[in-house]
C-alpha cells in the first residue's frame, strides 16, 4: 500500500504540518512513548488503522461497532481526543477546511449530536448493507457523502471517511487501491473536494449529489491511470497485447466480472476471452474466484 503518501496526505488535508519525508522518518523509527505532539500522534494512529485495514479487511464489516472501533484506533495516540474516541459526538460540529496558514473555514453545518446523529448513522449503515442495485463505486461515494454530512464523531471524520473508502474499495474487489494513494489525489484537489461538498450541501435536504459523485469517481479514475502508467514504466504493461490491456482494464473497473460479460463488452468471441484470461492468470495479474459457471475475475 502507498502508505507514507496516504498517511501524510490524509492528515495534511485536516491541517497536519508533517511532510511525506517526516512521516517516513516517524514510521521507520516509531516509538509510541515519544509521540508528544499532535501531528505525530495523528499520523501514528492513521498508519495503524490503514495497516489494520490492509491486513484484515475481509473481516472488517461495515457496522456501527466496526466504524466506532476504527475511530477508536485512529485516535489511539491523540492526547486531546481520549475523551471522545470511539463514540459518537456529544457536541455539534461542522465540516471545516484547513489552510496552510492555520486558518479554518466552515464548509457546512452537520447533524446535531445525540439522537439525530445516532439515527442517521443507523439508517446510513443499514442502507449501504441492504442496497444491491447501485454500482459499488456509486454506493461508496454516496456513503462517504452522507457520512461527512452527518459528521458522527467529534473529530477525525474526514480522515476516517478516507480510511472507510479504502476499506470498502478493498472489500468490493478494487485491490489496486493498495498500490496508489487515494488520499494524495484528494489532497491535490482539496479545493475541488470542499467545493463539491459545499455545492451539494447548499441544496439540503433534497440535494442532488451528482457533482460529488463525479468528483469522487474522477479521483479514482485518475489514480487508476497513474497505476497503469506505473505498470507501463515497469515493463509489465508493455508485455500485454491490446486485447489483454482492454480486458485487464475492464476487470479493474468491474471486480468479480465473468468471462461472458467481458466478451459481450468487447464484442469478441468467448473462447478468445477465456484464452486471454488464462494468460493474465499465468502472468499473475488477475485471480479467479468460484468454479464452473460462477467463475469471476479480479485484479491481484
Predicted regions and their residues:
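FIC/Doc superfamily catalytic core
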Residues: 1-300
